[in-house]
Design a protein with these regions (language model features):
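C-terminal motif of bacterial Sec signal peptides marking the signal peptidase cleavage site
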Residues: 26-29
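Bacterial N-terminal signal peptides that target proteins for export
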Residues: 2-17
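A structural motif detector for short, solvent-exposed N-terminal "entry" segments of globular domains
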Residues: 409-455
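Extracytoplasmic
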Residues: 78-80, 87-89, 126-128, 291, ...
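Exported/periplasmic cell-wall-interacting domains
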Residues: 417-419, 452, 457-465, 480-656
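Intrinsically disordered, low-complexity acidic Ser/Thr-rich regulatory segments
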Residues: 73-75, 226-302, 541-584
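SH3/SH3-like (including bacterial SH3b) beta-barrel domains
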Residues: 94-110, 277-292, 359-372
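Boundary regions of SH3-family modules and the immediately adjacent low-complexity/disordered segments
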Residues: 32, 37, 50, 58-83, ...
Length: 656
């Protein structure tokens, strides 16, 4: 049987991290229609037209991406002087004063063009410098005109040429996050049963360092669109994840990078910029719990004085022992670019046991099995047999509504569509997302919305429904495993907060007491099977327990989790909140307080409700959507607030 089918890649998953902010933006009114027209009879039409063309394969290749034009990153300098960011985030203000409106923020290590001289020094000893395209940054604590500053050379901005902006890894065993290279004796004192751990690691090293092809192995064009049948070598961009060395997979330039200059001699030549503050004499700043997702920018091996261990460098310039983390690559799954030959309506297979059917004389007959997350063009017809709805493919087979998610034209159009503007449509029932330019669909994919489906979002993990606009966009930020974020309109629960201070908090009045947002734990009904480690993370971390049940103020049987400095928990847990952090969750776009579109590198069940309220996208899809929506993040910036200064946010319509 030859079905009108587009093969889409299914893969496995991962973990990560996030902290952002919400800037005010109004929601435009529009009417949303049902995903499919009413069942008017045995051959009722699916809403919308269809080309009926058989489509080619949109394969996930072991390739990397070309840099989409206009992406944030180091801004081209030309002959202009530059301003370098020396704190983890530096706020961009509309006017040269720290009480002015916040337009966005920059990330450590970034260099952006600046005015030749400061425009003023009110409240800023180093002076306020104008940067492009708008705004002012204070030189001093957060930024410098000295481009030889050690921290600028030590840090590394996100890589936006690939689907994931950093290398990522998950914590396999509780670990200290060192601020300098520890000696052997210091490691034995800081890490429980270290000798036993190292013995186990050396016996299992090949297995625990193994990776699969992932998001950064997908070939994408200059717009971030997946390229069919293109492999990494064909694009001339280097090696695949499975060909890279262990050091490369942890963010290193090579597999044998030396100890960085700022860590030579067992000392630290740059300040600690992490959210866990130290007094200068400590050897580590906080601990990371099992399943924590880390973003990495480098790696190096040590000599016998440090047990010969390799250390990875986190994005906030802390060190983690490589024996206690496992690199991962995110899901290579992605959606489809649409064109005249491939357009709506489409059906994505959401069940791993799906089959096609024939309907003969009103009786349903089983035909061939269907590939999980493959996509099929539909001819606009549907039938209902014994209470089950079936959709007709363009090559005259039937698909059960129980097995697929539909991407179809809406019954009614929002005003932005009528005016030819960009807008996003998300169906919670179908778990699909479509990018529209006016009434032309340009991209379609599967997503994971809230676990609670169509329940009331105010009292559950359901995704909010309605019409919204993108409020702010972040290249990456930190979340906890309940996907609470200090910049998402809810109280921060996992430490940090610098990103929220930088982006602003215009939605405190709208914050809900319970955190919606995507989680690493899914309880929804699903045909999809979460990959290995993710299945464990879904149940939370049961491997670590509080050191004491009884502390002052504790109710009978209640465990009090320390707010800071606990040897086992550090600042990574709060009562009633997530148990581990997901650092630098990529491509976050908030459209409502506590609700965002973002990449999820910790799971691979897209097409199944999974989150705590956010809309999870595969990394390749999140990258594509992020650089398609408005407002664009200016070159060199890490986040931007939508509004009259930086541009109106793209419309987002979420419906059943």
């Amino acid at each position: 049987m030859t079905l009108a089918m587009v093969r889409l890649v299914g893969a496995r998953a991962l973990t990560a991290a996030l902290i952002l902010g919400i800037a005010g933006a109004g929601a435009a009114a529009c009417q949303k229609g049902p995903a499919v027209g009413a069942d008017a009879g045995p051959d009722a039409a699916v809403s919308g037209s269809v080309t009926g063309a058989t489509t080619g394969a949109a394969s996930v290749a072991s390739g990397a991406a070309a840099l989409p034009s206009g992406l944030p990153g180091d801004a081209p300098a030309g002959d202009r002087p530059l301003l370098g960011v020396t704190s983890f985030v530096a706020t961009v203000y509309k006017e040269p004063r720290d009480t002015a409106k916040k337009l966005g923020y920059l990330r450590v290590g970034t260099r952006v063009p600046r005015s030749a001289e400061p425009v003023g020094k009110a409240g800023c000893a180093g002076g306020w410098y104008a940067i492009e395209p708008h705004g002012y940054v204070c030189a001093g604590e957060d930024a410098t005109t000295d481009l030889d500053a050690p921290i600028l050379k030590a840090s590394r901005p996100p890589n936006l040429k690939t689907a994931l902006p950093y290398r990522y890894a998950f914590v396999r065993a509780v670990l200290p996050m060192y601020v300098r290279v520890p000696t052997a004796d210091e490691q034995y004192k800081a890490e429980f049963k270290l000798k036993e751990h190292l013995d186990w690691y050396h016996q299992n090293e090949a297995e625990v360092t193994k990776v699969a092809l992932g998001a950064n192995d997908v070939a994408i064009d200059e717009r971030g669109v997946p390229v069919a049948d293109k492999k990494l070598g064909e694009l001339g961009l280097g090696k695949s994840s499975q060909e890279l060395g262990f050091g490369n997979m942890l963010g290193g330039d090579t597999d044998a990078d030396p100890v960085p200059f700022w860590l030579e001699g067992g000392k630290r030549a740059i300040p600690n910029i992490s959210d866990f503050k130290t007094k200068g004499f400590e050897i580590f700043a906080d601990r990371a719990r099992r399943h924590t997702g880390l973003s990495l920018i480098g790696s190096f091996a040590t000599g016998p004085e440090s047990l010969g261990r390799r250390f990875a460098i986190t994005a906030d310039l802390r060190l983690v022992p490589a024996t206690k983390i496992k690199p991962d690559t995110g899901s290579p799954w992605h959606g489809l670019e649409l064109a005249d030959a491939l357009t709506l309506p489409l059906a994505f297979v959401r069940s791993q046991s799906a089959r096609s059917y024939k309907i003969v004389h009103g009786k349903v007959q089983t035909a061939d099995s269907l590939d999980y997350r493959s996509a099929y063009t539909l001819n606009g017809k549907m039938r209902t047999v014994e209470g089950v709805r079936y959709y007709r493919t363009t090559d005259k087979h039937w698909l059960s509504a129980q097995d697929v998610g539909l991407a179809v034209p809406p019954a009614t159009w929002p005003d932005d569509a009528e005016k030819g503007r960009k807008w996003i449509e998300i169906s919670i029932t179908n778990q699909t997302l479509v990018l529209w330019e006016g009434k032309k669909p340009v991209y379609a994919t599967l997503v994971s919305t809230g676990q609670a489906g169509l329940d009331d979002p105010k009292h559950s993990t359901a995704t909010v429904r309605g019409t919204f606009r993108i409020r702010n966009k972040h290249v990456s930020a930190m979340m906890d495993s309940n996907e609470s974020s200090s910049v998402g309109g809810h109280a921060n629960t996992t430490g940090g907060g610098s990103a929220r201070a930088a982006i602003g908090d215009d939605d405190r009045s709208a914050a809900k007491p319970a955190s919606p947002a995507t989680a690493a734990a899914g309880k929804g009904k699903t045909h999809a099977k979460a990959g290995g480690k993710d299945a464990k993370a879904a149940k939370g971390d049961k491997g670590a327990k509080p050191k004491a049940d009884a502390k002052a103020g504790a109710a009978p049987g209640e465990k009090i989790i320390p707010k800071r400095g606990d040897g086992e928990y550090g600042v990574t847990r709060r009562r009633g909140e997530g148990t581990f952090q997901l650092r630098d969750v990529p491509y976050i776009q908030y459209f409502e307080s506590g609700y965002a579109l973002h990449a999820a590198y910790w799971h691979d069940v897209f097409g199944t409700p999974r989150s705590h309220g956010c809309v999870n996208l595969a990394p390749v899809d999140a990258h594509r959507v992020f650089f398609w929506t408005d407002p664009p993040v200016p070159v060199g910036w890490h986040a931007v607030n939508a509004g009259e200064d930086m541009g109106e946010g793209t419309l987002v319509v979420l419906h059943e």
